[in-house]
């Protein structure tokens, strides 16, 4: 595979009060928050619109399972289906099955510390 990760897709973290945290970041750091957190838009080297998501989540979310970590990183990738096969061949733990939505494909792995990592093959144009 030529490329694996092409950029940071998002940072997700647990907090006791996501709305309070979003309001604090909006007031003091100027983040333009919505129900999901904050989306940062940027352009890749080819000039395509891309996004990175910042999302505080409820402390009791099960989305990070099987990891017990209070955060989860999301990486933008190319050719997720092939990448998941290659990672499995390399002995990496793949969590669950790949899921496809109108805004991209998602897959999950665990790093050596047991942190769940989300891999996203985005369709940014669907988010514009």
Residue spans for each PLM region:
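Short secondary-structure boundary micro-motifs
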Residues: 25, 57-60, 82-83, 90-94
């Amino acid at each position: 595979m030529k490329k694996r990760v092409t950029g940071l897709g998002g940072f997700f973290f647990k907090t006791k009060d996501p709305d309070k945290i979003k309001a604090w970041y909006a007031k003091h750091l100027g983040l333009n928050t919505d129900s999901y957190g904050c989306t940062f838009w940027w352009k890749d080297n080819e000039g395509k619109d891309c996004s990175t998501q910042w999302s505080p989540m409820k402390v009791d979310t099960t989305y990070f399972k099987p990891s017990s970590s209070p955060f989860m990183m999301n990486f933008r990738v190319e050719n997720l289906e092939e990448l998941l096969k290659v990672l499995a061949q390399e002995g990496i733990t793949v969590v669950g099955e790949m899921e496809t939505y109108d805004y991209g494909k998602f897959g999950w792995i665990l790093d050596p510390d047991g942190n769940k990592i989300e891999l996203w093959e985005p369709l940014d144009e669907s988010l514009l």
